[in-house]
Amino acid sequence: MGDVMSEKIKIFENPKAKLVRSENYNFNFNKQSGLFMRWGKTEDDDPIVGLPEILDIEVSEICHGVNNVPCPFCYKSNVGYKGRNMSLETFKKVIDNFFFFNSEGVSMTPLTQIALGIGDIDSNPDLKDMILYARERGIIPNITINGDRLTDEWVEFFAKNLGAIAVSIYDKDISYNAIKKLTDAGMTQVNVHFMLATESLEKAYEIMNDTKTDPRLEKLNALVLLSLKQKGRGEHFTRLSQEEFTKLVEYGMSNNIRLGFDSCGQQKFIKAVEKHSNFKELEQLSEPCESGLFSTYINVEGKFFPCSFSEGTEGWEDGIDCACDDFDFLKDVWFSDRLVEWRKKLLGNCRNCPIYEV
């Protein structure tokens, strides 16, 4: 990452925590609980741009779906064995390129965690080694799965090495059984991921009710509702209106259901709770789109895009290669003209998605 940031930003780290300190950008990250706090010049100041704190990295495109039925709204349009796997060599190069040497000659990174993107749980034979390498480098690995093909061996490995795991709901029995296996193995950060659209709204209410009644979900951490981006097979789905979204949020909160939302839907969430008694607290806990501001995405080829949904869109028809030698992430990506231009669009749109109507 070069030497520029090592002079201006200090990173302190031990097995329990990572701290970043500078004049205008600071954060505390608890590696054990996942608690994260960020501030600027003062504790009341929110920095506009920082460093990459979270890395979403696609390690496989191969996905047969659940019971060999592809997901009908997959924005990547992944199908069977037609996809590619990221090699372990590429993965290591990408991770290593997020590190820099401080003034004491210690290799450090602002990354707190990586989210591994995969279809079939067993599609990439190097997945375990990738997770172990992230751990070796002091970065907490997380993953999203669909619950299919989850053997006891995978459960044991995930429980030992992941910080958190999300289970997408396609087939309820398969997903709920997977959640129970993972929580029974001692994992406390197990979430449900579910994509919201007009076509999936009824099932969203069904899952919310299940979190209160199905014993397999007794130790579930939260139900995370994801916003529809009309890309790939998702083009054929209908985005939820603000009215429908607000009703859903109100139902969840009134029934004490632990809900979470992706940053793409933050603006809708804020409108949904604007009359709530603890609005200020809810607003403080939510964050709008952070792509290219605090988070990054690397695809299966090792190429950078602001987020996975921006891949192939105008200005990002091709990404920036992050797996090459003699690479400086700060110079070649973080402060590149392309990413600076992206930030202008995102910030100029009040951190609402500049690509999709969410």
Q: In which residue ranges do the predicted regions lie?
A:
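The −1 position to Zn-ligating cysteines in a subset of zinc-ribbon hairpins
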Residues: 62, 70-73, 288, 349, ...
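Short, small/polar residue-rich loop motifs at catalytic or cofactor-binding pockets
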Residues: 289-293
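C-terminal accessory region of radical SAM enzymes
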Residues: 243-280, 303, 307-358
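Short, acidic, Ser/Thr-enriched surface-loop or helix-capping motifs
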Residues: 31, 47, 298-304
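N-terminal [4Fe-4S]-dependent radical SAM core
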Residues: 2-58, 279-282
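Radical SAM/AdoMet-radical enzyme domain recognition
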Residues: 88-118, 124-227
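A short acidic, helix-capping loop that chelates divalent metal ions and anchors anionic groups
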Residues: 80-82, 231-236
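Canonical Radical SAM [4Fe-4S] cluster-binding loop centered on the CxxxCxxC motif
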Residues: 45-93, 307-309, 314
